[in-house]
Amino acid sequence: MAKHLFTSESVSEGHPDKIADQISDTVLDAILAQDLKARVACETYVKTGMVLVGGEITTNAWIDIEELTRNTIRDIGYTNSEMKFDANSCAVLSIISKQSPDINKGINNIDPREQGAGDQGFMFGYATNETDVLMPAPITYAHRLVARQSLVRKNGTLPWLCPDAKSQVTFAYDEGKVVGIDTVVFSTQHVENITLPNLKEAVMEEIIKPVLPIELLSEHTKFFINPTGRFVVGGPMGDCGLTGRKIIVDTYGGMARHGGGAFSGKDPSKVDRSAAYAARYVAKNIVAAGLAEKCEIQVSYAIGIAEPTSITIETFGTEKISADHLTALVNEFFDLRPYSLITMLNLLQPIYRETATYGHFGREHFPWEKTDKAILLRDAASXIC
């Protein structure tokens, strides 16, 4: 592979789509805290002055959707009516029904190990050794930039920042290896009375420089900070937001393929979410074991059926053992039936609100980021070679 560029983007917790994701996952967490057998598919829509929460939920739990929604918006930072979206005054509407009994019948089984997949579909997991968290560099640093924006906004370092922001980072590669950062784009919402020169200087000094490795920057790196100038109108006033509309931001920034299913608001019986987490877990352990420098795994399911309909591994020519041997190891060490992967990764717990910002992958405290199978895979592979 010759020299090439690759770009990924991320968005802040105050981006309209991410507000929606966080509300959906906050509802999910509140339900799971009371009812681990709940079935949740929660969708959220946000626009100027209003939030609509809908979906299909079957549970014995009681939750206050309005209060959960307002608290989430308040935590993000929309607490001023001048933003035209305020936790204290926005309308909160909810339209919730129960899960279809036809779907429920296909999922539940007398033997929990034979729990069927909640829907048909295919999911991808990916890992690469180009960063310490075994994630692609472009999406990793795009996430870290918007996370830094939130930090300096909330701790008072840059009090004139507002919640909505976007980042985009273009990395340069040579023969598949990171060699530098070509371009950085950063746009942040701000209050009225900050000048553009002051904003650009502050963003560079307090957000960009503390995050991006200096050895990857050069005199040729291009920086575009609020390139359109003014960014006062943002959040749901500027754009409507919807759960599940940032699926590439949520995963690998376009570096790997995507099955199309979103994550937020879905309980672990939905393989769109849980199997994508499991696929990341498998791919990461393969790379951590040194069996490949890059690994993408696809897994697919039929609704109501426990066993995956396919498992496919792609290592882009970086494998140390054959694809057939890798597939055999995956089948030996990872049970990807829905109930088994939920148990393997301890997914029935209220941990999902945090996943809704700054990516679902690459943060070590999530259970699907463990590399506890790497030694087992390495030892088993050594017996093959």
UniProtKB/Swiss-Prot annotation:
Q: Where in or outside the cell?
A: Cytoplasm
GO CC, alphabetical: cytoplasm
The EC number(s) given in the record are 2.5.1.6
UniProt cofactor note = Binds 2 divalent ions per subunit. Binds 1 potassium ion per subunit.
Q: Where on this chain does Mg(2+) bind?
A: D17
Region annotated Flexible loop sits at 99-109
Pathway field: Amino-acid biosynthesis; S-adenosyl-L-methionine biosynthesis; S-adenosyl-L-methionine from L-methionine: step 1/1
Q: Which GO terms describe its molecular function?
A: ATP binding; magnesium ion binding; methionine adenosyltransferase activity
The answer, when asked if Aminoacyl-tRNA synthetase is one of the entry's keywords, is no
- Sequence positions that bind L-methionine: E56, Q99, D239, K270
Query: Which Pfam families does this UniProt record tie to the protein?
Result: S-AdoMet_synt_C (PF02773), S-AdoMet_synt_M (PF02772), S-AdoMet_synt_N (PF00438)
Q: Which Gene3D superfamilies match?
A: 3.30.300.10
InterPro entries (alphabetical): ADOMET_SYNTHASE_CS (IPR022631), S-AdoMet_synt_C (IPR022630), S-AdoMet_synt_central (IPR022629), S-AdoMet_synt_N (IPR022628), S-AdoMet_synthetase (IPR002133), S-AdoMet_synthetase_sfam (IPR022636)
Q: According to its UniProt record, which reaction does this protein catalyse?
A: L-methionine + ATP + H2O = S-adenosyl-L-methionine + phosphate + diphosphate
Cofactor(s) required for function per UniProt: Mg(2+); K(+)
Keywords attached to this Swiss-Prot or TrEMBL record, sorted alphabetically, are: ATP-binding, Cytoplasm, Magnesium, Metal-binding, Nucleotide-binding, One-carbon metabolism, Potassium, Transferase
Residues bound to K(+) are: E43
Positions with a binding annotation for ATP: H15, D164, A165, K166, R230, F231, D239, R245, K246, A262, K266
The biological process GO terms on file are: one-carbon metabolic process; S-adenosylmethionine biosynthetic process
The similarity annotation says: Belongs to the AdoMet synthase family.
Subunit (UniProt): Homotetramer; dimer of dimers.
- Physiological role: Catalyzes the formation of S-adenosylmethionine (AdoMet) from methionine and ATP. The overall synthetic reaction is composed of two sequential steps, AdoMet formation and the subsequent tripolyphosphate hydrolysis which occurs prior to release of AdoMet from the enzyme.
Which NCBIfam families does this chain map to? Answer: metK (TIGR01034)
The protein's matches in PANTHER family, at most eight in alphabetical order, are given as: S-ADENOSYLMETHIONINE SYNTHETASE (PTHR11964)
Report what the protein is called. Answer: S-adenosylmethionine synthase
What is the protein's species of origin?
Answer: Baumannia cicadellinicola subsp. Homalodisca coagulata
The organism's taxonomy opens as: Bacteria, Pseudomonadati, Pseudomonadota, Gammaproteobacteria, Candidatus Palibaumannia
| Gene label | metK
